[in-house]
Every structure is written in structure tokens, then in C-alpha cells.
């Protein structure tokens, strides 16, 4: 197992169904000789040169710090250090991906939750010792870490099914969904393009905005509409009225209706 072999496995998994993609990536969590060799090499380089920077991307999000060994639209392979929370989390993140987690310095301790209908329910405790590989289907499962047990180091792989990835943030006390997001890089690129067209005043590109209004998630449709209104308010009024009347999401209908009421001219009192 080498980093080059990992890169080849990620490439091979790119167009595979979820089970096939997992079959390509799972061996690199079962045998982490490649990771240990990389750590040994980089430690030697830093001893020889205190200014040496490892040739991988580093990132931080919340309590997690990450070294990124592979990242594509579908597959991430990362080494992570998580600072434990002072108290148990009140919300759960269902990432929409399949997670493979190998603890490196201590056991993973926590509580497993699953989705039944639209609610999160407790499934029981989790104990994954060092050297084991914990697998979670984070489309329907989420782990709440036990607070206060010291930093946790893990090697992780996150593998998405083909197509857009839907993540959910669910309140533990009520079990209800608090937020939905679609990790859809195609839509993100589309929205960036629409923003550029708007900044350039490209009113001749209105058909691009019309086409993007059929995005699958409510927040995506509303984001497109805001760009459309900023580009050409007059041209956007008809699709805005359609959205206020017929959008599948009640909140989007309400936002569109409120916006339409502010934009439509007042009738002449004469």
C-alpha cells in the first residue's frame, strides 16, 4: 500500500457504485502501512528542516483538524484530530456519505443514532478500539462522541453514493430536522457562474437563470432566484410569481410571495 496506490484506487472508484467504491477504498483503512510510512518520512523531513511543510492539504473545521490525502467530489481520505466536546452535542450531522473510521490513539467512544422516518433515534453505545475500522452509513446513521475523553486521532474515508449528496442536521432533543444541505459541486459551480453573469450585467443570459430554477433543494432554488432578481428584476418577476404560486416548498413560496409583494407596483389611486 502506497500513496500512489491510494490515488489509483480513488480514480478507480470514481464511477463505481457505492459498494464498488468502498471495495476500492476499504483496504487502505485495513492496512495503514502507507500512512505510517508517510508519517515516518515527513517526521524525518521536519527534523532535518524545521521549515518543511508536508505536501498535502491541511484544513480545520470546528473541533477537527485534517490532513487531506485524497479529495474528489465523491471520495475523501483524511487523517483527523478531533478535540473532544466539553459536553455532548445537541445536534447530529448525517453527512449523506459512507464513513470508514480507524482510531489511531484511543478507542472511539460514543452513541449511535439512526433515522426512522424523519426523526433521529438512539441505537446504542459504540466502542471501536484502536486498530479496528468502524463503518457508518451516514445517510441514516450518526455518531455522537463521548465528551471529555481527550483528543481523538483517526484515519477516515468518506465515500459518497453517485449523484448529489444530501446532508441533514437533526436536533437530538426533538429528533427533528433543523437543516438540509445538498453537497452538489455541479450546483455550486452553476451558482458561481450565475453570480459572475450577474456581476457582469449579462441580462442576455436570462435563460441560464430560468434553467437553474429547477434545482432539487429549496435553498438552491431560492439562491438562484436572488441572483436572477439582482441581475434583471423585471425579467425575473414572472418566474418569481410562478415560484410564489407553485414551488413545492412552503417556505420558498412564502419568501417568493413576500418579495413579489414588495416589487410589484402599487396601483394608481386615480
Functional labels for PLM-detected ranges:
Residues 186-187, 217-222, 234, 249-251:
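Alpha-helix N-cap/helix-start positions at coil->helix boundaries
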Residues 1-76:
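A short, N-terminal "cap"/entry segment at the start of jelly-roll beta-barrel domains
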Residues 99-102, 115-146:
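Short acidic-glycine-tyrosine-enriched beta hairpin
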Residues 172-178, 202-213, 233-245, 267-270:
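Amphipathic alpha-helical scaffolding segments comprising HEAT/armadillo-like alpha-solenoid repeats
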Residues 94-110, 114:
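Short, conserved beta-strand element in jelly-roll/cupin
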Residues 99-101, 148-167:
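A short hydrophobic beta-strand segment most commonly corresponding to one strand
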Residues 191-200, 222-231, 254-264:
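Structural detector for internal amphipathic alpha-helices that build alpha-solenoid repeat scaffolds
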Residues 77-95, 127-129, 137-139:
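Conserved short histidine dyad/triad with adjacent acidic residue
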